[in-house]
């Protein structure tokens, strides 16, 4: 059995990790930690776990005494909060999957520019592995620290990677228009997340300065060995969970829709969790699953390729992708514990 600990277990992503790891046939949950609910039973925070998870959440001081009992620790904390425990865990030889943005950007100056805090573990950035399994499976197998991708970044990179790697589009023409459910804002109390503030409305935010922008650019640039700059605009929509990314770029090769679909199908032919659909995609078809559904189209009038990509932000955009990474890291079938169809209603 893989012995795991979860730090930050009572946030939306943390509780999703608990759900997935509880039903995983190869996992034993050794401890759950929470900054806000230390000393409380996990199922008193989330009543749906009564009878299933009886664990009491522990504080960080106690975590340090329990780390020796685990093989891997999941960090489900906001950015800037995981540095101490990542360093502590790595020094003990424990594998780490970090779900914050703290180790995604390889350039510490870029991190400091976008996240507005100094990076105290610059040396660790050299060997952190970007945990997007469909694209970096070989690196993940050898990792000691996996930085789980952001939700917007996951949907966008998966949608655009074939276009970049196959050199099908003008690199400077990429636009990503993305929508997220409200759970993407986290569980902490924020005015903009209150029901009356976010229901029956839509709004753009982070225009020109969203932190997933450099993450998307960095990973796409790896495929063409040149710096890609793109336009990324996220929006908040009144649904609980889900990401819908619509990606646009100018074609530089003479392709029709059928040829483009075939190129995508071949690119992802060995990736179980990627579905290239003939139909237009919808968020509800991937809800509560680890799947990424995408649809490709060409606007012949403007010579634009349009790729629509949908994921569940708490699953493929966070927790289930982290479990997929763990499976790869420990050499088990990456579908283990994740072969779950969407619950569309």
Curated annotation (Swiss-Prot):
InterPro entries xrefs: AGPR_type-1, NAD(P)-bd_dom_sf, NAGSA_dehydrogenase, Semialdehyde_DH_NAD-bd
Pathway terms, separated by semicolons: Amino-acid biosynthesis; L-arginine biosynthesis; N(2)-acetyl-L-ornithine from L-glutamate: step 3/4
Keywords: Amino-acid biosynthesis, Arginine biosynthesis, Cytoplasm, NADP, Oxidoreductase
GO biological process, one term: L-arginine biosynthetic process
Catalytic reaction equation(s): N-acetyl-L-glutamate 5-semialdehyde + phosphate + NADP(+) = N-acetyl-L-glutamyl 5-phosphate + NADPH + H(+)
SUPFAM superfamilies in the cross-refs: Glyceraldehyde-3-phosphate dehydrogenase-like, C-terminal domain (SSF55347), NAD(P)-binding Rossmann-fold domains (SSF51735)
Subcellular location: Cytoplasm
Main location (coarse class): cytoplasm
GO cellular component, one term: cytoplasm
Coiled-coil features, chain-numbered ranges: none
Enzyme Commission number, as recorded: 1.2.1.38
Gene Ontology MF annotations: N-acetyl-gamma-glutamyl-phosphate reductase activity; NAD binding; NADP+ binding
SMART domains associated with the record: Semialdhyde_dh (SM00859)
Pfam families: Semialdhyde_dh, Semialdhyde_dhC_1
Catalytic residue positions: 151
Free-text function comment from the UniProt entry: Catalyzes the NADPH-dependent reduction of N-acetyl-5-glutamyl phosphate to yield N-acetyl-L-glutamate 5-semialdehyde.
Protein family membership: Belongs to the NAGSA dehydrogenase family. Type 1 subfamily.
Record's protein name: N-acetyl-gamma-glutamyl-phosphate reductase
Source species: Clostridium novyi (strain NT)
């Amino acid at each position: 059995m893989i012995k795991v600990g979860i730090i930050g277990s009572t946030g939306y992503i943390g509780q999703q990790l608990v759900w997935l790891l509880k039903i995983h046939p190869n996992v034993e949950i050794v401890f759950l930690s929470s900054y806000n609910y230390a000393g409380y039973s996990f199922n008193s925070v989330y009543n749906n776990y009564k009878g299933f998870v009886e664990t009491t959440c522990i504080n960080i001081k106690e975590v340090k005494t329990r780390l020796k009992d685990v093989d891997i620790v999941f960090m489900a904390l906001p950015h800037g909060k995981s540095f101490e425990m990542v360093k502590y865990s790595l020094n003990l030889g424990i594998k780490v999957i970090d779900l914050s943005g703290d180790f995604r950007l390889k350039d510490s100056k870029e991190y400091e520019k976008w996240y507005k805090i100094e990076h105290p573990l610059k040396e660790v950035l050299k060997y952190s592995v970007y945990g997007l399994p469909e694209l970096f499976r070989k690196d993940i197998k050898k990792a000691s620290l996996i930085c789980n991708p952001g939700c917007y970044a996951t949907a966008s990179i998966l949608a655009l990677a074939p276009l970049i790697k196959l050199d099908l589009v003008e690199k400077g023409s990429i636009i990503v228009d993305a929508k997220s459910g409200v759970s993407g804002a986290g569980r902490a109390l924020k005015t903009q997340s209150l029901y009356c503030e976010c229901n029956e409305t839509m709004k753009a935010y982070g225009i020109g300065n969203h932190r997933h922008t450099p993450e998307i650019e960095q990973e796409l640039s790896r495929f063409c060995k040149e710096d890609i700059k793109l336009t990324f605009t996220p929006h908040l929509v009144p649904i609980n969970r889900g990401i819908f990314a619509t990606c646009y770029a100018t074609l530089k090769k003479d392709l029709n829709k059928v040829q483009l679909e075939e190129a995508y199908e071949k690119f992802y032919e060995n990736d179980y969790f990627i579905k290239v659909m003939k139909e237009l995609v919808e968020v509800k078809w991937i809800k509560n699953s680890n799947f990424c559904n995408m649809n490709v189209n060409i606007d012949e009038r403007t010579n634009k390729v349009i790729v629509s990509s949908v994921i569940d932000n708490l699953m493929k955009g966070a927790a289930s992708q982290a479990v997929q990474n763990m499976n790869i890291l420990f050499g088990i079938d990456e579908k283990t514990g994740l072969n779950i169809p969407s619950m569309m209603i």
